Swiss-Prot record:
PANTHER family: ZINC TRANSPORTER 6. It is a multi-pass membrane protein. This is Zinc transporter 6. Residues 394-411 have a biased composition (Low complexity). Has probably no intrinsic transporter activity but together with SLC30A5 forms a functional zinc ion:proton antiporter heterodimer, mediating zinc entry into the lumen of organelles along the secretory pathway. As part of that zinc ion:proton antiporter, contributes to zinc ion homeostasis within the early secretory pathway and regulates the activation and folding of enzymes like alkaline phosphatases and enzymes involved in phosphatidylinositol glycan anchor biosynthesis. Keywords: Golgi apparatus, Ion transport, Membrane, Transmembrane, Transmembrane helix, Transport, Zinc, Zinc transport. The lineage of its organism: Eukaryota, Metazoa, Chordata, Craniata, Vertebrata.
């Protein structure tokens, strides 16, 4: 699309070049004959890939990724030649290593990116999504192995052991080399934070029993073992037993049994990690952090000037990073910046992305009476007598008229105070009851000396209201028309 320029000639014959933009605005600037083309998705991916490869740490990850693809291709060909389902299940662990390398590369990209307007908390959730996707895909592969193994139990084919043992050692060597050479922070954190799998628990029980006989092995066996290393060793052990039984007794069904065992161990190892990463994606609060957060919130509520801590919400935005928002209500005379600094100092040690809303107390309590109110309501005749004896309340200037909620004068232009109830009667005309007694409006002040009517000591003039239930007479605002007063 060509952008047109409008040439305007002023009175001084000075040319002014203006470029018409998309928003229909004319601005001064350089003429661009063609609009800048938008990049495609592949172009954006290529740009981000060049950004990652600019760091030398990614070269090692890319090298292991290429070796993984070559090794996985060789293992899949050997699985086809040997017709071994157990070796196929073990090859899926190599494919999982490829997913872990991609996750590691994505983690490096996240550290290089800065938060944007769309992703204000950063791109850490991409790591969580990568871990969740990898573990779920491996579990789906395990279910596929279980389905194929059930079909093989009906009709067991012959298994060739020519490259079975070679493929086992090649896969074990490459898997351990990848796990121990490349530091994968997301999977390391998940393996430590997630709950232990049933395979880890059984191995821990065997390790305790063995360490009771040989105490020297306690430093090696008693600590919590890496679940990825454990599943690789257990799978290689199952393949070794399968090779021996097929070679010695030609027991081909052992291959299917080993495939089922490897699939179950893989599913049991990946399931706790997928659950943990799924909870992070759901923005939940980790269970091991709830107690610490409660303790910190109690400390914040005891700070000087803090009246209330409410609407607290904390969630995980990534592995090891916690975000939160809290509302703090403080006194009117408290220093907002000082309270904010103290709250931030207490919570920032645990919550990396913290939002604190500090607002001052705006509650105002209406004081409608300065004396002691009567225990029983007054009758209508008592109101009439009081209105006849005492004169009306002296009028105040408009600028100094008290409000129902506060005792301070309010300006004519100021709005009514917050939480003040718009009680009727302040600007109402005097009300006359159609009875034989003299009447005065209900808002008359009690200023007469010596008479209190059960309202306590005489106080300043203010509005006093009582509720009249089922009054026998109607009342209007006008001239008295009843019988003559006595």
């Amino acid at each position: 699309m060509v952008a047109l320029d409008v040439l305007g000639i002023t009175d001084s014959d000075a040319p002014v070049y203006r470029q018409k933009q998309e928003a229909d605005t004319l601005v001064l600037g350089t003429i661009h004959p063609f609009r800048k083309a938008h990049r495609s998705v592949l172009g954006k991916l290529a740009q981000e890939f060049r950004l990652v490869t600019s760091d030398r740490r990614s070269w090692k990850i890319l090298l292991f990724g290429v070796l993984n693809v070559v090794c996985t291709g060789c293992l899949l060909m050997w699985c086809s030649s040997t017709n071994s389902m157990a070796l196929t299940a073990y090859t899926y662990l190599t494919i999982f290593d490829l997913f872990s390398l991609i996750t590691c590369l994505l983690s490096l990209w996240v550290t290089m990116k800065k938060p944007s307007q769309i992703y204000s908390f950063g791109f850490q959730r991409f790591e969580v999504l990568a871990v969740f996707s990898s573990t779920v895909l491996v579990q789906l592969g395990s279910l596929f192995i279980l389905k194929e193994s059930v079909e093989r139990f009906v009709e067991q084919p012959e298994v060739h052991t020519g490259r079975l043992l070679v493929g086992t050692f090649v896969a074990l060597f490459f898997n351990l080399l990848t796990l121990l050479s490349v530091k994968n922070k997301p999977f390391v954190f998940v393996s430590e934070a997630a709950s232990t799998s049933w395979l880890q628990e059984h191995v821990a029980d065997l390790s305790r029993s063995l360490c009771g006989l040989i105490p020297a092995l306690s430093s090696f066996l008693l600590p919590r073992m890496n679940p990825f290393v454990l599943i690789n060793l257990a799978g290689a052990f199952a393949l070794g037993i399968t090779y021996m039984l097929i070679e010695i007794n030609n027991y081909n069904a052992m291959d299917t049994a080993s495939a089922v065992a490897i699939a179950l161990m893989t599913f049991g190892t990946m399931y706790p990690m997928s659950v943990y990463s799924g909870k992070v994606l759901l923005q939940t609060t980790p269970s091991h952090v709830i107690g610490q957060l409660d303790k910190l919130l109690r400390e914040v509520s005891t700070l000087d000037g803090v009246l209330e801590v409410r609407n607290e919400h904390f969630w995980t935005i990534g592995f090891g990073s916690l975000a939160g928002s809290v509302h703090v209500r403080i006194r009117r005379d408290a220093d907002e910046q000082m309270v904010l600094a103290h709250v931030w100092n207490r919570l920032s040690a645990l919550v990396s992305a913290l939002t604190v809303h500090v607002f001052k107390d705006e509650w105002s309590r209406a004081s409608l009476s300065s004396g002691v109110l009567p225990s029983a309501p007054l009758s209508l005749s008592e109101y009439v007598t009081a209105a006849a004896v005492f004169p009306a309340a002296p009028s105040r200037a408009q600028g100094s008229e008290p409000t129902p909620a506060t005792s301070t004068p309010a300006k004519p232009s100021s709005p009514p105070p917050e939480f003040s109830f718009h009680t009727p009667g302040r600007h109402v005309q005097p009300v006359v009851f159609q009875t034989a007694h003299p009447h005065r409006p209900l808002y008359g002040g009690l200023q007469g000396p010596g008479v209190r009517l059960g309202l306590g000591p005489r106080g300043p003039t203010l509005q006093a209201y009582r509720t009249l239930s089922a009054a026998p007479h109607t009342y209007t605002s006008g001239t008295y028309t009843g019988p003559p007063r006595p």
